[in-house]
Curated annotation (Swiss-Prot):
GO terms for molecular function: UDP-N-acetylglucosamine 1-carboxyvinyltransferase activity. Belongs to the EPSP synthase family. MurA subfamily. It is found in: Cytoplasm. Pathway: Cell wall biogenesis; peptidoglycan biosynthesis. UDP-N-acetyl-alpha-D-glucosamine binds at residues 93, 122-126, 308, 330. Phosphoenolpyruvate binds at residues 22-23. GO terms for cellular component: cytoplasm. Its EC number is 2.5.1.7. This is UDP-N-acetylglucosamine 1-carboxyvinyltransferase. The modification 2-(S-cysteinyl)pyruvic acid O-phosphothioketal is found at residue 117. Its main location: cytoplasm. The lineage of its organism: Bacteria, Pseudomonadati, Pseudomonadota, Gammaproteobacteria, Pseudomonadales. The gene is murA. It holds the Pfam family EPSP_synthase. Keywords: Cell cycle, Cell division, Cell shape, Cell wall biogenesis/degradation, Cytoplasm, Peptidoglycan synthesis, Pyruvate, Transferase.
Length: 421
């Protein structure tokens, strides 16, 4: 199992390119199953989850053609099985996204429950109830969701999401694209990745309006045609590198990104004392060698502050001037990284869904362990400005969401290297 060794204390400086968004690429890949011809998806990030989705397609009889320019061509007409097996689904919760497209296009699907996810848990329940509202008959047995469309296919429906669910919105929107009649999704997720998926579906001929608001209207069509589409930039990767620049007092320009989808994060970075300038597809952050000021953060669904940037801002507050509160309203148990940061000397107190962080001038390098994707990013950020060496174990979490992280940080001057476990 690979590890990262980071020698801290280097001020980051330079330019990097931002990769395509994993959280957009995965549903877009799933949506290719709706098409009755070949589809090309460009700007895919080279990440483990993307590889797993492509492997899932291969297991189903589809043979994606990948080129060196980060694009893939998928022709779903060669599909031979409508089963998404557990050995693949367990490694990637987003594989539930093939459920809606398969039922809508092929009339049935058998998808393993995502690993560690009981049926009573709200996110999976929303996917199932949304499809049932469209007429699907669904059984959950043996750890699999078995879904069958009614005779004549799925029917348009009005569906209200009890809680805002990004993947739930995406799954039902994809299914509705080929359903008979109109579907209206209320309390829908507003995330940019949902908008990107809607734009991809529209490029294939879907009739969708309202994406980016809490009410999405879909008028089902008989078929979706071939298209070529470029995945949006990754806003969380963008934010992560900007925070890394801020904690090291550095200057970093991120290119091939979109400032308009990261406004809540950029405002907090300005509040922390960063000079932030933007163009149509770039953001530059300059700390001028200063130590950041502590900021208060409260996570909430888009367009508010994203939960996927919470851990990074705990790392920022850990070395900032003053004390900042970070309130997590989206997920439980999302402060696992705090206990690893304690090993580096961070002063953090967790009270329920709130982390109170008192900044300290210097963190000390230490052996730490990544517990999940975004927590691992917070450890990298803290290691970049810590005194001495930090060894980060279980970095497969990082590889799920950050393309070539050590190479990109090396381009900015960081002393970071990957070593085999």
């Amino acid at each position: 199992m690979d590890k990262l060794i980071i020698t801290g204390g280097v001020r980051l400086d330079g330019e990097i390119r931002i990769s395509g968004a994993k959280n957009s690429a995965l549903p877009i890949l799933a949506a290719t199953l709706l098409c009755d011809g070949p589809v090309t998806v460009a700007n895919l990030p080279h990440l483990h989850d993307i590889t797993t989705m492509i492997e899932l397609f291969g297991r189903m009889g589809i043979e994606p053609v990948i080129d060196e320019k980060l694009s893939v061509e998928i022709d779903p007409r060669t599909i031979k099985t409508l089963v998404a097996p557990y050995e693949l689904v367990k490694t990637m919760r987003a594989s539930i996204l093939v459920l809606g497209p398969m039922v809508a296009r092929f009339g049935e699907a058998e998808v393993a429950l995502p690993g560690g996810c009981a049926i009573g848990s709200r996110p999976v329940d929303l996917h199932i109830r949304g499809l049932e509202a469209m007429g699907a008959v669904i059984d959950v047995e043996g750890g699999y969701i078995k879904a069958k469309a009614p005779e004549g296919g799925l029917r348009g429906a009005n569906f209200f999401f009890d809680t805002v669910s990004v993947t739930g919105t995406e799954n039902i929107m994809m299914a509705a694209a080929l359903a008979r009649g109109r579907s209206v999704l209320q309390n829908a997720a507003r995330e940019p990745e949902v908008v990107d998926l809607a734009n991809f579906l529209i490029a294939m001929g879907a009739k969708i309006s309202g994406a980016g608001t809490d009410t999405i209207t879909i008028d089902g069509v008989e078929r979706l045609h071939s298209a070529i589409y470029k995945v949006m930039p990754d806003r969380i990767e963008t934010g992560t590198y900007l925070v890394a620049a801020a904690v090291t007092g550095g200057r970093v320009k991120v290119k091939d990104t979109d400032p308009t989808i990261l406004e809540a994060v950029l405002e907090k970075l300005k509040e922390a004392g960063a000079e932030v300038t933007t163009g149509s597809d770039w953001i530059e952050l300059n700390m001028h060698g200063k130590r950041p000021k502590a900021v208060n953060v409260r996570t909430a669904p888009y367009p508010a502050f994203p939960t996927d940037m919470q851990a990074q801002f705990i790392s920022l507050n850990a070395i900032a001037e003053g004390t900042g509160a970070v309130i997590e309203t989206i997920f439980e148990n999302r402060f696992m990284h705090v206990y690893e940061l304690h090993r580096m000397g961070a002063k953090i107190q967790v009270e329920g869904n709130t982390a109170i962080v008192t900044g300290t001038e210097i963190l000390k390098g230490a052996p730490v362990m990544a517990t999940d994707l975004r927590a691992s990013a917070s450890l990298v950020i803290s290691a970049l400005m810590a005194e001495g060496d930090t060894l980060i174990d279980r970095i497969y979490h990082i590889d799920r969401g950050y393309e070539c992280i050590e190479e990109k940080l090396q381009m900015l001057g960081a002393k970071i290297r990957r070593v085999p476990g």
